[in-house]
């Protein structure tokens, strides 16, 4: 007898550079990079995999440290996906892909959850939540702020 298994969503594989981001997510904290020289927060995603060359986007300092964010954000932009590109998402069609802007000024791609797509509005206040994808990985998503 053949067993048919459902498609599984791809799970990010943390590396040395991204470990603080994913460790924070496992503990319920959204971690961002913060420049010690000028205080600018920036997205960690642009630097995952290239920690030795990471520079501040504002002053070009190499003094970047991981810091917890407030977890608050606003919806900057979004698109609704009606076409199936990955079988693992079949049960979620249509789903949203969102760009959120954290209170620290960092824009990141994520998803708004716990909200019908029809109620999504640019500028709506959001708060971070985390989807546990495995024992070792959780990813940030956002929901309407209470």
Which residues make up each language-model segment?
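Short, cysteine/histidine-rich loop/knuckle motifs that typically chelate Zn2+
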Residues: 34-37, 55-61
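Well-ordered alpha/beta subsegment
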Residues: 3, 105-146
